[in-house]
Amino acid sequence: MLQRIKNLRKPKVETLNTINISRENIINNIKLIKSLKPDSWIFPVLKSNAYGHGILQILDILKEEKFPYIVVDSFPEYQIIHNNSNFKILIMWETLPENYRYFDYSRTSVAIYNLSTLNYLISLNKRIKIQLFLNTWMNREGIQEKDLERFLTLLKNNPKISLDWVMSHLYDADVEENHINLQIANFKKMYSIIEEYWFKPRWRHIGASAGICSIDDTFFNAWRPWLILYWYSPFSEEKELLKKLKPALSLTSSVISLQKLSPQDWVSYNHRWIADKDCWSATIPFWYYEWWLRNLAWKLTYYYHWKQLEQIWTICMNLSCCIADSNMKIWDKIELIGNDINKKNSIAIIAEQANTIPYEILIRLDRGIRRIVY
């Protein structure tokens, strides 16, 4: 309550750049995900600042729904969720041992794949819920089959540590010729060893966004949607199942300068762009500090209302330019990223122009840009 009063007293400072998050579209995506797995539990993934959408903003939307757990990957993200909601939290990746002293284990379950971490948790002498992260041949992290019984023996001898989950991660579920069935077979083989020790974990999960669309196996009773929560498909080709997803993020900037140009006038560094007719250029305060990669120069399309604007000249650290519309005024808004998949400033198109993937575009959006849920 005190914090709310303090916030009311703060001056409302408007920002030049704003990321807008559609509550309606996120809710739409949640409903679609639940419809794909109606008999399973859904654990939304908010790691990497909710893929650039903002943890607090997405958290505010998710409060309208019921989920057993919210998934994050780090201690700092755990703190944000814990301090701003009543959700239970699943930590997907390990942290430094000394940090485990600070978790609220009444609301937290942690992933384990190192014996040293498990031994440290045992030394805390607390009741702690854990999940065993199995290595089903991705070989990035996880418990190998040859080591599994050492973990199980420790758990059997230390009943304060409760095995509630078993999980793994798919390494090529987003391609047509994949090894999903091989990984599932490995998972089930290791799970049978867990059962031999008389453990009955509540949840079994191996699939994230691609797995939700690719696996139809009732053995798994939980799923971890990440990209598709925000609309972005993990597949290179569009899946019929995902056509009803809606992008939730758009980004606008503000015109801070308008310059009238004559033929042969140039713009910014090194005379890289020269006008071939009378025109105006508009400058906006957004470039590679805020995220845009330098290799996107000359490739982007901005929108002023529904009119396309060509981005021009080599970029600066905090500024970029485009051809201005004749009706444009100082402080007018320009849309840099749109949430319409058919427009040239969609995340998918920008990622293609940058020769990267949509995730990288999203997670690199500067955390300092104000994010607003509408």
Where in this protein do the model-derived segments appear?
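Glycine-rich phosphate/diphosphate-binding loops that line cofactor/substrate pockets in enzymes
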Residues: 30-40
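Short secondary-structure boundary/capping segments within folded domains
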Residues: 34-36, 51, 275
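Active-site anion/phosphate-binding pocket segments in diverse small-molecule metabolic enzymes
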Residues: 2-23, 27, 76, 95-97, ...
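Active-site-proximal beta-alpha core segment in soluble small-molecule metabolic enzymes
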Residues: 4, 13, 17-21, 25-27, ...
